[in-house]
């Protein structure tokens, strides 16, 4: 649609948008993709729970980089943090994740950050750190994922937990810190 109208449109491509029937079709297709992703996450969890013989006490999902069509909020780099909503904010492979409850803060667009945030780009991290440094940082956590292809995900490439916890208080209550005992991240050679 954009290419057909681009010759006559005063809107730059980087600011192009859809409306009307095209917008409705986009939302329809996006909902299908989001539903598929949710079912895929559930299938993975069901397999792990069954294989490990776990008993599920509480279950919820946290997604990022999506359109919340119920509230018409575009979340890029953020997750929903409605009042009372359970959510997870991952920090890094070493330090784990924050288990939180949303406060529904309108000043934060009823959202929270979807993670710690990078201190540097993926390519910069691969140049700045070594696999040896990465292995040392992951001491005490079982992982087969430390290697050159996952160096961009090393803990040193992300902001620290204290930086995040100290800044998200208006959006969420931090209920617990989940520390990893096992970590898996697919890489190029996996």
What are these regions (language model features)?
Residues 3-190:
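Domain-length cofactor-binding catalytic modules of enzymes
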